[in-house]
Amino acid sequence: MDFNLNDEQELFVAGIRELMASENWEAYFAECDRDSIYPERFVKALAEMGIDSLLIPEEHGGLDAGFVTVAAVWMELGRLGAPTYVLYQLPGGFNTFLREGTQEQIDKIMAFRGTGKQMWNSAITEPGAGSDVGSLKTTYTRKNGKVYLNGSKCFITSSAYTPYIVVMARDGASPDKPVYTEWFVDMSKPGIKVTKLEKLGLRMDSCCEITFDEVELDEKDRFGREGNGFNRVKEEFDHERFLVALTNYGTAMCAFEDAARYANQRVQFGETIGRFQLIQEKFAHMAIKLNAMKNMLLEAAWKADNGTITSGDAAMCKYFCANAAFEVVDSAMQVLGGVGIAGNHRISRFWRDLRVDRVSGGSDEMQILTLGRAVLKQYR
């Protein structure tokens, strides 16, 4: 495997550097984090560069650039301090609709290309069904030629402002043999109530509880095949976990570089703290973790481009990178000392964000469970 960037990938990465140097984005990110605001202006700038077209097939006007290119872009954005967790729907969100959606649904979502606006997200998790997706209670019921949605969802990302969500629900007419189907829901419909939740981190992307009270849908609002909900979201979970891991790496790399610059400038006892062996030890361990993360992610991206990536690969990336990145940021914060915890340094935001990522997108424990099963399956 050769992970040297080709000319097209180098061009994208150079464009990212140019964009990030064009203004003081950090001040904007700090404001958005403080006020829990989606950084639409920044995402629009990325969309105008074509970031939201990276994985769209050429026949649909996309770049079909592949996952190694996505990885290179994500890593560089993260290294430069960008909150890439707000971008999870950009590389793959359009493709999901091209595969599963009706033409009407596709047209509605594709209209968001190049805008930077939030467009849709999945609504799966419920108060009584987190990792145990099979315990979903939200139902759809057919009556008089219509479909009615009832139930509640929680911890749904981006849902404060997205105009559409794809809701997984079970067939109310089949209680003994659960049938899970997804529905494309316009958030302006009567009977929908959205309650925004506060979070420790990842504050630039909303998190909400949503209730559905006799929300009326049509058969044409079904998303994908009847009863195919589980199969569809399994692929989405793998995709999301890979992107979360990329975000973790980029954030950790940014914290590492911030701390390294500080260690080479901060003077105590007559010399820079970077000359002290205890500080050097921290950087040695941080560098080892960062190198391991990077190689794991690039291998996974290569597998994705070659059609060989598995759920075990995605779980391995998510678990290892979420934990290793948090350890790197925590060590970097220790190097920064009071500057990292009492000032307005961005590392405090990174620390909060990475702690959340060990729960969101699939908890550490679920990644270990998925990975353990995948490993043993190879030897049956």
UniProtKB/Swiss-Prot annotation:
Keyword 4Fe-4S assigned: no
NCBIfam families, sorted: PRK03354.1
Record text on subunit structure and interactions: Homotetramer.
Gene3D superfamilies named in the record: Acyl-CoA dehydrogenase/oxidase, N-terminal domain, Butyryl-CoA Dehydrogenase, subunit A, domain 2, Butyryl-CoA Dehydrogenase, subunit A, domain 3
Assigned protein family: Belongs to the acyl-CoA dehydrogenase family.
CDD domains: ACAD
Annotated GO biological process: carnitine metabolic process
Catalysed conversion reaction: 4-(trimethylamino)butanoyl-CoA + oxidized [electron-transfer flavoprotein] + H(+) = crotonobetainyl-CoA + reduced [electron-transfer flavoprotein]
Task performed by this protein: Catalyzes the reduction of crotonobetainyl-CoA to gamma-butyrobetainyl-CoA.
HAMAP family, per the entry: CaiA
EC number(s) on file: 1.3.8.13
Species of the source: Salmonella arizonae (strain ATCC BAA-731 / CDC346-86 / RSK2980)
Cofactor(s) needed for function: FAD
Protein name as it appears in the record: Crotonobetainyl-CoA reductase
Pathway where it operates: Amine and polyamine metabolism; carnitine metabolism
UniProt-listed InterPro entries: Acyl-CoA_DH_CS, Acyl-CoA_Oxase/DH_mid-dom, Acyl-CoA_Oxase/DH_mid-dom_sf, AcylCo_DH-like_C, AcylCo_DH/oxidase_C, AcylCoA_DH/ox_N, AcylCoA_DH/ox_N_sf, AcylCoA_DH/oxidase_NM_dom_sf
Compartments, record wording: Cytoplasm
Molecular-function GO terms, alphabetical: acyl-CoA dehydrogenase activity; flavin adenine dinucleotide binding
Flavoprotein found in the keyword field: yes
Keywords, comma-separated and alphabetical: Cytoplasm, FAD, Flavoprotein, Oxidoreductase
GO CC field: cytoplasm
